[in-house]
Amino acid sequence: MTAALARLKRKFWLAPVSNGNISLMVDLARRNNFLWDAILGAEIAHDYKRKPDVYLASCAAFDLEPEQCMMVAAHSNDLEAAARLGLRTAHTARPDEYGPNTGERAPTVAVDFAAKNLAALADTLGV
């Protein structure tokens, strides 16, 4: 995953939009060598994902319009909420997220891109 993130970072700003707190996300990033440009989400927006303010505050943090941003997630409901606000969307499969065959293998909503993992998404996006 870190190699795919490094590829994506060559062309795009990267920031998780998390319902977790910032200190948790920093610990996760340090432990796994995730080189985020920022950490966004619930603490910044003072609300939780799938509320519009979470996605809009994340776009605003980079001084971008929603149409200039892409939400990448393994959860179709997060992608659906982001798409309603004009963000582009990419689904990455995590079929074993909570154990064997417990996660999404494919999106259940319309998305701009669907990939089996972040490396495949980087390939699709040309980085």
Regions flagged by a language model, labelled:
Residues 1-11:
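Catalytic-core regions built around general acid/base machinery
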Residues 6, 17, 22, 26-127:
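Asp-based, Mg2+/Mn2+-dependent phosphohydrolase catalytic module
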Residues 11-12, 86:
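Glycine-centered short loops/turns at secondary-structure junctions
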